[in-house]
Every structure is written in C-alpha cells, then in structure tokens.
C-alpha cells in the first residue's frame, strides 16, 4: 500500500469525537479536508489549534479521512486581540465557503501569508479585504472593478451598485449603499490610502459575500462586535 505523502495544513476547526478522538477540519493546498484524529489528548493532539503550520499525513479514500501523522512545520502565528478575531474570521469564511477536497493551492499560500502579516501586527483592514477578494476570485465569484455590467469603464465620477450575480451597475440617482467610481478604481489598484477606499471595500465585500454565506450569522463577526 502506498504511503500517504505529508502535506502542509492548518486547523480550521475541531471538536470532540467519540471518547478520545477529535474531528478536525484542515485547510491544505488540496482544499478543506475533514479527518479523525485518534487519541486527541496525546502529544499530537496539542497541535490541534488554529494558526499552527502543520505537516499532516491523511489516510483514507472517503470524505472522512484519518490522521496518520501530524507534526509542527514552523512557528505558529500568535494572534492576540483584534488580530485573533480576524484570524478566526478567515477560518470561518473558509469553513463556510470552501467545498470539500477542492484544491486551492494559491489560496492556501495567501492564507499563510495573511496569518504571518496578522502576527506581525500589520493593519487589519487591508489584509482582511485582500483575503476576502482572493477567496471570491478563487471560488469564481469575483467581478471586475474597472468595468461595469455593460462592459463600460468604471468612471471616476460615477455611482455604482453591486449586482452580485453580474457585477457593478452604474446608476444615475443617488441612493443608500452605492459606491463611488473613485473608490472602486482605488480598490482595483489596492490603493488603501485613497479617501473612502477601506470603508467602501468593507461594504463591497460584505455585500458580495452575503449571498454565498446565507442567513446564518458569522460567529466570529459577533465575537468581534462584543469584544
């Protein structure tokens, strides 16, 4: 029988399973994978926590794998305060939106870099907005920030609304929830210093993600509000 190849991974979520085991959701370059970790209270079980880079050996052909081996693969991103809530938010997005066992190697790399940046104390909002956009893009839900639904260039003096199923649509009358063309063009260039860019990015990503997340509130978002 072929020996499974260890692969890099992070723990997204874990919970007790039967008497001494844990059911663990991992994020790997091969996607989100669920596996049973037996003897979860052993030394290996101490690694089952978020933001720790791991090397895991997963066995089995079904959707529910077994952890054959697990080791630390580097220094954990020690997140505190708002950075911790931000990391938990990223994990919850991945748990809610990633299909099981669909490869996302580029997203995995971006996730790793984002955790490192959070641990280094980088400003949170640009990191979160960049990750949300990358996630939408990887899942096939992204839209152009430089062209509207009619294939016209986004105008700096224009007003736009998001049609989640299509993209940005120019409107003539001001109404709540619109985006200025200057803001959208700044986001297209990841120019977070532009006036209104960060706030517009937060509103835009929330609108874009909402339809895919559904009505169930994000636990991490509620925790952040109550901090």
Curated annotation (Swiss-Prot):
Q: What is this protein called?
A: DNA repair protein RecO
Main function: Involved in DNA repair and RecF pathway recombination.
* Species whose genome carries this gene: Pseudomonas putida (strain GB-1)
**Which terms in the GO cellular component ontology are assigned?**
bacterial nucleoid
Q: What keywords would UniProt list here? A: DNA damage, DNA recombination, DNA repair
Q: Which lineage do the record's taxonomy fields give for this organism?
A: Bacteria, Pseudomonadati, Pseudomonadota, Gammaproteobacteria, Pseudomonadales
Which GO BP terms, alphabetically?
A: DNA recombination; double-strand break repair
The record's annotation in Gene3D superfamilies points to: Nucleic acid-binding proteins (2.40.50.140), Recombination protein O, C-terminal domain (1.20.1440.120)
Name the protein family. Answer: Belongs to the RecO family.
């Amino acid at each position: 029988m072929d020996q499974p190849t260890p692969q890099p991974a992070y723990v997204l979520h874990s919970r007790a399973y039967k008497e001494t085991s844990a059911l663990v959701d991992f994020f790997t370059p091969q996607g989100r994978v669920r596996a049973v970790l037996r003897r979860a209270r052993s030394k290996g079980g101490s690694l089952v926590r978020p933001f720790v880079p791991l090397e895991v050996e997963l066995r089995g052909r079904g959707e529910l794998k077994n952890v054959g081996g697990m080791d630390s693969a580097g220094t954990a991103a020690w997140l505190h305060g708002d950075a911790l809530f931000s990391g938990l938010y990223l994990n919850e997005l991945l748990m809610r939106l990633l299909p099981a066992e669909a490869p996302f190697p580029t997203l995995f790399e971006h996730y790793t870099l984002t955790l490192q940046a959070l641990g280094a104390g980088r400003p949170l909002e640009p990191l979160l907005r960049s990750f949300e956009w990358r996630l939408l893009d990887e899942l096939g839900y992204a839209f152009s920030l430089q062209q509207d639904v009619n294939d016209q260039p986004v105008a700096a003096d224009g007003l736009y609304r998001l049609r989640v199923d299509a993209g940005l649509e120019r409107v003539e009358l001001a109404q709540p929830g619109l985006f200025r063309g200057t803001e959208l063009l700044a986001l297209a260039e990841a120019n977070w210093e532009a006036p209104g860019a960060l706030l517009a990015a937060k509103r835009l990503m929330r609108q874009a993600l909402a339809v895919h997340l559904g009505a169930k509130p994000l636990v991490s978002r509620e925790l952040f509000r109550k901090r």
